[in-house]
Amino acid sequence: MLFRSDTLGAMSVCDPQNSMHGIYGSYLSEHIFTKAPKLGFNSDCSVEIKILEENFEKNHEQIAGFIVEPIVQGAGGMRIYNPQFLQKARELCTKYDILLIADEIATGFGHTGLMFAVEHANIKPDIMTVGKGLTGGYMTMAAMITSREVSSVISNSEIGVLMHGPTFMGNPLACSVANASIDLLLESNWQSNVKNIENIFTQELQNAKDLKLVKDVRNIGAIGIIELVDDCYAQKVQDYCVKNGVWIRPFGKLIYSIVAYTIAENDLRKIVKTMIDAIKSIEK
């Protein structure tokens, strides 16, 4: 399956305030959204869980599936949150016979320290989407993985197949690259590498916490994030970083890096230091 995140259907289930909803307006179909869990892997998300429960109780007859980016919301603000939220979502989906759909496009294949982010909550989704890490970034490819129950419904339907066919679906070269990438990952010491990356991110990002232009720093696995107080500084930070040999792509007021598991320690420290130096240069 080809990774096509910017279709109308995909955009319609993204953040209604900070995504492309505003640009496309009434072209996108309406969906029910719930309050995002509080920032922090160990933060108390009881309020958001309560709201989630109320949403399910009120709207479950209208809900076919609950779509969530597990543990880390990507385009929704690079938000890291408590696995308890996912556990409650799984419980509610089971209770009301609703499909739990985990979007692991950005988090899958080790980015959060476990092979898949849902493992932090010890749950199994009914449908999981994967991409990016599927081929190690070398080829464009994504996939939808389903439970046996879901696949049986599709297989036993009148048509007998999932009627979805992007131009490059099942691309032989991309499939070969995906197989090779997964083999290399499983043969490597990736979990130890990602843990070391996480520790370095934790250490180095502390140097940004007290800067006046920084609202928050957070990290998990191979993902490190600096949230600025305003997005007006992002372009200057990017310009500084590129000029000093570090390529970054800010997202709104977020300066972040998702690094390769094979990155050298000195390169990782340089990335974080350069991002921090960029912010300091603006504060002068």
Which residues are covered by each model-predicted region?
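Conserved N-terminal phosphate-binding loop of PLP-dependent enzymes in the Aspartate aminotransferase
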Residues: 1-284
